[in-house]
C-alpha cells in the first residue's frame, strides 16, 4: 500500500530536507523513524526539497509498505521516534497513482520578516529580521509584477539545475501583522532560491532603495546579478502543497502556527 504523510519541521539544525552523506537531514530522520514503525527500511518521496535552515509546515511525502498499520500508528509511532523539531501532522492511505512530487499542482511558501529595531530572542531561528522600516504596501505592489507565467532567471540561483526558468506565479501577497511582515507566494513550482531571491528584491523596495516598477525591470532583465541579495533561510516556510481533490488529502492550518491561518 501507499501512505501519504503531512510533515512539519524546524529546519534550523538540518542541512536541508534531502538525505546526504555525513550530514543531518530531515529526510533521514523521518525515514529512520518510519522504518522502526514498519519494521522494514522505508524510503520517502517529498513534494519539495527545502534547503538548509528552511522550515516546513506543509511538506507532503509518500512511501510504500506491505505492513498493515492504522494511520494513527504511523503518526504516533513516527513522532515517538523522531527529534522534537520534526513532526508528522497526518497520515492517510492514497491510490497507487499518487506521487508527492509529480501529482502536486502548486506549492506555497511564506517568508516571515520580524520588522523591529531589535532582533527577536525566542523566534530568532523562525523568522528573518530587518531593523529598519519596511513599507509592506510598496512590497506588495512590486510583487504583482511577478504574477502569471514568466521567465524567473533574475530570481534563480546560478547553480540551479532546473531545465527551464519559466514558472507560473499564482499569487504573491505581502501583509503586515504587528511587527511581522509575511510574504505569501504560490506558484506551480519554484526554481532554486526563487522565494528568497524575490524576497531580497522586495526588501530593497520596502526600504525605499528601489521603486515597485524595478521588479518588472528585473524580470525582463533575466540577469541574477542585477536583482537583490538572497534573503536568509530562517524566515522561509514551505506551508502548503496543492493536489487534485480526488486524492482526498487532509487540509490542515497552513502555519506557521504562531500566525493566523488567514492573513487577509
Curated annotation (Swiss-Prot):
UniProt-listed Enzyme Commission number(s): 5.4.99.12
Catalysed conversion reaction: uridine(38/39/40) in tRNA = pseudouridine(38/39/40) in tRNA
SUPFAM superfamilies per the UniProt record, alphabetical: Pseudouridine synthase
Class in the EC hierarchy, top level: isomerase
GO molecular function: RNA binding; tRNA pseudouridine(38-40) synthase activity
Signal sequence interval, chain numbering: none
GO aspect biological process, one term: tRNA pseudouridine synthesis
Residues noted as binding substrate in the record, renumbered to the chain: 109
Function, in words: Formation of pseudouridine at positions 38, 39 and 40 in the anticodon stem and loop of transfer RNAs.
HAMAP family for the chain: TruA
UniProt record similarity statement: Belongs to the tRNA pseudouridine synthase TruA family.
Subunit structure, as described in the record: Homodimer.
Name the record gives this protein: tRNA pseudouridine synthase A
Organism for this UniProt entry: Vibrio atlanticus (strain LGP32)
Amino acid at each position: 500500500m501507499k501512505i501519504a504523510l503531512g510533515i512539519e519541521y524546524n529546519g534550523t539544525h538540518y542541512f536541508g530536507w534531502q538525505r546526504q552523506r555525513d550530514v543531518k537531514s530531515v529526510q533521514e530522520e523521518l525515514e529512520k523513524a518510519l522504518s522502526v514503525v514498519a519494521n522494514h527500511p522505508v524510503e520517502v518521496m517529498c513534494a519539495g526539497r527545502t534547503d538548509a535552515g528552511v522550515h516546513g509546515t506543509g511538506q507532503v511525502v509518500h512511501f510504500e509498505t506491505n505492513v498493515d498499520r492504522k494511520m494513527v500508528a504511523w503518526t504516533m509511532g513516527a513522532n515517538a521516534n523522531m527529534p522534537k523539531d520534526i513532526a508528522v501532522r497526518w497520515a492517510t492511505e492514497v491510490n497507487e497513482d499518487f506521487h508527492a512530487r509529480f501529482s502536486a499542482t502548486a506549492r506555497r511558501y511564506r517568508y516571515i520578516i520580524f520588522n523591529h529595531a531589535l532582533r527577536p530572542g525566542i523566534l530568532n531561528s523562525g523568522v528573518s529580521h530587518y531593523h529598519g522600516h519596511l513599507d509592506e504596501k510598496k512590497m506588495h505592489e512590486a510583487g504583482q509584477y511577478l504574477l502569471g507565467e514568466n521567465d524567473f532567471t533574475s530570481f534563480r540561483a546560478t547553480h540551479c539545475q532546473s531545465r527551464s526558468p519559466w514558472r507560473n506565479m499564482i499569487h504573491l501577497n505581502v501583509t503586515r501583522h504587528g511587527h511581522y511582515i509575511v510574504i505569501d507566494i504560490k506558484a506551480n513550482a519554484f526554481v532554486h532560491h526563487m522565494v528568497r531571491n524575490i524576497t531580497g528584491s522586495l526588501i530593497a523596495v520596502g526600504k525605499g532603495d528601489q521603486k515597485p516598477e524595478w521588479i518588472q525591470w528585473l524580470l525582463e532583465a533575466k540577469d541574477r546579478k542585477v536583482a537583490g541579495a538572497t534573503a536568509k533561510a530562517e524566515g522561509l516556510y514551505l506551508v502548503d502543497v496543492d493536489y487534485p481533490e480526488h486524492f482526498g488529502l487532509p487540509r490542515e492550518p497552513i502555519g506557521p502556527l504562531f500566525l493566523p491561518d488567514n492573513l487577509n
